[in-house]
Amino acid sequence: MTDGLGVSVGCAVGIPCGVAVLVAVIFWYYMQRKFKKEIEDDEESMSGDGTISFTNLHSMRVPDNPEKDLPVSHVVGGSTSSDNTTTAQNVATAGQMEAQQSQPSKKPKNTYMPAYRKRLNSSLSTLQHQDEQRSPTDSSSTSLDTKNQNGRAHSTVLDQMIPVLAQDDNAAAASSEFSLTHERTSSNDNLIKNLHNHDFGSYPKRRSSGNLTGMISGNVSSASVHTRTSSVHSGKKNNENVFDTPNSQKFHEAVAPSEEDAESKGMRSYYMLKNNYDVENASQIAEEDQYENEFTNYSESKREFINSLRPKKN
């Protein structure tokens, strides 16, 4: 009974674990094959300056057939000499024939080519045909051809991935002229609108001088203005101490009082914090403090605090 129970438990646990491990190994093997295949396909595209070769891009490549220097045969007979040289077209034709003969015959692959790739191939073939039909005497076409050849010599991945479609020269010139004139007129219109509508930090209009003088005279002659004794309109020297506490003195002086009026008003009622104490009594206040009153007697509070720290006598 015990052996049967162990076998059943082992089968119930071991069989699912074995199947799971087997499935994991199979998936790992297929993934490794897939990764290896992708790495082999992307070997050429990993380098930034390398050429890109896809399975459907063989028709887009332009065969570079450099002209080979063939020996020139000179036949000299008597007083006459004839030079038998081959033309450039014959050399190019011979090179293409040799390349075709040297390459082994390949079976065409049945690969799917999307519509945009077909259209791209047709546009490239049309562009190549137009370049061949151009006259070599045209300076503009010659300069363009030389630029294209230099570009092909040092092509990058970006140059190969972005196609260049054919365009009519007349249409390109007309569109460029129209765009230039349109941009010029639109820029001028925008500049004029901005000049009219833009606020260059404008300030409000200046008030008239008559209103300002009226306002100044009214403020000066007003009797409700309360100023300090050190005001510019006061003819008497200021006797107020800046270190004293604020007082409740009320100034009812005129704008420009005379010295006699100031002397007649010599007796004024000042309110200062030191008036709450008897300054002559030194036992109550050791030193005069203008900010001390009956609620904030700092000297007395300090004395009481020090006395509280001393040991008490029993």
Curated annotation (Swiss-Prot):
Q: Where in the cell is it found?
A: Cell membrane; Bud membrane
Cytoplasmic face of the membrane: 30-314
- List residues in topological domain: Extracellular: 1-8
Q: Where is the composition biased (Polar residues)?
A: 48-58, 240-249
Which stretches are transmembrane?
9-29
| Its membrane topology | Single-pass type III membrane protein
Q: Name one GO cellular component term.
A: cellular bud membrane
* Region described as Disordered: 41-86, 125-151, 230-266
A Gene Ontology annotation in the biological process aspect, one of them, is:
cell wall organization
The alphabetical list of record keywords is: Cell membrane, Cell wall biogenesis/degradation, Membrane, Signal-anchor, Transmembrane, Transmembrane helix
Q: What does this protein do?
A: Plays a role in cell wall integrity. Affects the cell wall polymer composition in the growing region of the cell.
Q: What is this protein called?
A: Suppressor of lethality of KEX2 GAS1 double null mutant protein 1
- Supply the source organism's classification: Eukaryota, Fungi, Dikarya, Ascomycota, Saccharomycotina
